[in-house]
A protein has these predicted regions:
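N-terminal secretory signal peptides that target proteins for export/translocation
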Residues: 1-10
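Cleavable N-terminal signal peptides of Sec/SRP-targeted secreted and luminal proteins
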Residues: 11-30, 524-537
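Extreme N-terminal flexible tails
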Residues: 15, 19-57
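A post-motif C-terminal structural segment
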Residues: 35-52, 61-67, 77-83, 87-130, ...
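Hydrophobic residues in beta-strands of the RecA-like P-loop NTPase core, especially within AAA+ ATPase
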Residues: 71-74
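His/Cys-centered metal/cofactor-coordination and adjacent catalytic loops
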Residues: 144-159
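Glycine-rich phosphate/pyrophosphate-binding loops
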Residues: 161, 166, 171-191, 506-510
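C-terminal GPI-anchoring signal of eukaryotic secretory precursors
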Residues: 509-525
Length: 538
């Protein structure tokens, strides 16, 4: 790394420093600023015409009934994160990045989702999860309960429970699954099965005694009791399933990973005993997961860490499965059901990376989730599978500074501040732990490894943890009825659309009247007509 001492007022030094900044920004790309072909108007006109033709084909809507539903949820994946992840994906494959397409970019329908909670302008992941899973907006910090419930007040739970699309799918005879890179009892997945007035009640060990005595149940317990026989459960959170002080199978000597349950229950053992007459398997590492034969397993419980799974950049590739690997196994198990499936997939550690001000971690998590989206697309069909990709909320993350084409996404802007005469990175946070002042002056980032894995990007306001952002987030959709995600929507609209596409929940009857068939079906028209007639007569 180059280190340059900048002397205020010294024009020669300043000029030299700008040259060094430019070299740092462009180092390793080995490419012109942009491809020669982009200088020719024909390139852009041809591309636009190609895109136009693709858009015109969308007039022929896919109105099939969705046999399968997949929701990919990028926790904290605001639009700036999507854009930066796109550039990173391209740069990882040797491109300049901006022209790259994420898998989600290829989805034909895009909408915006308004993320506020009923009591919060800037949302948290619990209230938002209740919206996009249960179909109703809710208060921050609560999961699976309406806005009539008050956070941490146990006595406001009963009577205010709301059910999720995962439950609607299960009741319709579909297989259902949850895959996450966080704890399986974290905010996002918990709204799929739990009714809890506090997202932090992971086990009874985190609950106040009065709440336990009043009959409120911890989230881990609800995972196994509220919706019996969830077909696929994969993620972290192992310690919340075991008795307090029981050592962990992977980290037996580390007390911070010991069990947390005060009631002495071993929820994994209980699950194993309950499922012993079914084709069920418990796994806790990558080797065990990848040795699973989906044809011989109908139910799987995979708990790969005591807490959250490691960041993708830091995971042990020999022992820790990637999100893509978990998703592939999940779909291969779930798709055996002739009635189809519902799968919730969370790229949960995008959010954690941003909270820590570690943009590199966050963006690599987003790229990995996009990889999982691509894998899911390869093993499902657009004709019978509705796939939606969205975020629960955004973050105080952005990038700018007039960076040139192909600038490494983690690099410096091509200029100095005209206030303190110091360089700055393209990526910055509005608030967070990256605020650092040395001798009353902003830290000189050129003296740091600003492209390091755990570098904390500079922020405008000092906070121990960076906060969420309040702007709308994107919704990408493909498959049956994806066109119903088409404008600016309240976040709670999402599960209603997905349920309508699959004829489940409140919308289970509409297929009986409409037939739910489309000319987009790959089946013969006569077969489609026969299926429609069967639905009308039966």
């Amino acid at each position: 790394m180059w280190y340059v001492t900048v002397v205020p007022g010294n024009t020669t030094t300043m000029t030299f420093f700008l040259i060094i900044c430019s070299c740092l920004a462009w180092g390793g790309l080995g490419k012109p600023q942009f491809p020669d072909q982009e200088k020719d108007p024909l390139f852009w006109n041809t591309w636009a015409q190609h895109t136009l033709k693709n858009a015109l084909t969308l007039q022929k809507l896919n109105q099939n009934t969705a046999k399968n539903l997949i929701l990919f949820l990028g926790d904290g994946m605001g639009i700036p994160t999507v854009t930066a992840a796109r550039i990173l994906k391209g740069q990882l494959s040797g491109q300049s990045g901006e022209e790259t397409q994420l898998e989600m970019d290829k989805f034909p329908f895009v909408a915006l989702s308004k993320t506020y909670n009923t009591n919060a302008q800037v949302a948290d992941s619990a209230g938002t999860a209740t919206a996009y899973l249960c179909g109703v907006k809710a208060n921050e910090g609560t999961v699976g309960v309406s806005a009539a419930a008050v956070r941490s007040q146990c006595n406001t739970t009963q009577g205010n429970e709301v059910t999720s699309i995962l439950k609607w799918a299960k009741e319709a005879g579909k297989s259902v699954g949850i895959v996450t890179t966080t704890r399986v009892n974290h905010a996002t997945p918990s709204a799929a099965y739990a009714h809890c007035v506090d997202r932090d009640w992971f086990s009874d060990g985190e609950m106040p005694a009065e709440a336990v005595q009043a009959g409120c149940k911890d989230i881990a317990r609800q995972l196994f009791e509220n919706i019996p026989n969830i077909d696929v459960i994969m993620g972290g959170g192992r310690k919340y399933m075991f008795p307090k002080n029981q050592s962990d199978v992977e980290y037996p000597g580390d007390k911070k990973h010991f069990g947390t349950r005060k009631d002495g229950r071993n929820l994994v053992e209980e699950w194993t005993n309950r499922m012993k007459n079914k084709k069920a398997q418990y796994v806790w590492n990558k080797r065990e997961l990848l040795s699973v034969n989906p044809n011989n397993v109908d139910y799987i419980l995979g708990l790969f860490e005591p807490g959250d799974l490691p960041y993708n950049l830091e995971r042990n590739t020999e022992t820790d499965p990637s999100l893509t690997e978990m998703v592939e196994v999940a779909i291969k198990i779930l798709r055996k059901n002739p009635r189809g499936f519902y799968l919730l997939v969370e790229g949960g550690r995008i959010d954690h990376g941003h909270h820590e001000g570690k943009a590199k971690q966050a963006l690599h998590e987003a790229v990995e989730m996009d990889r999982a989206i691509g894998r899911a697309g390869l093993i499902t069909s657009i004709y019978d599978t509705m796939t939606v990709v969205t975020a629960d909320h955004s973050h105080m993350f952005n990038f700018g500074g007039y960076t040139p084409r192909g600038n490494t996404i983690f690099g410096l802007a091509p200029m100095l501040s005209d206030v303190d005469q110091k360089p700055f990175t393209a990526i910055l946070y509005g608030n967070g732990p990256g605020f650092k002042v040395i001798n009353g002056l902003r830290e000189n980032v050129s003296t740091l490894d600003y492209q390091g894995t755990n570098y904390q990007a500079q922020s405008a306001v000092p906070l121990r943890m960076e906060t969420h952002g309040g702007e709308d987030v994107a919704v990408f959709a493909k498959g049956p009825m994806a066109h119903l995600l088409h404008g600016v929507h309240e976040q709670n609209y999402i599960p209603h659309v997905m349920a309508y596409a699959a004829c489940i929940g409140q919308n289970r009857d509409h297929c009986m009247s409409s037939g739910g068939a489309s000319s987009l079906s790959p089946a013969l028209p006569s077969l489609a007509a026969l299926l429609t007639l069967t639905r009308l007569l039966c």
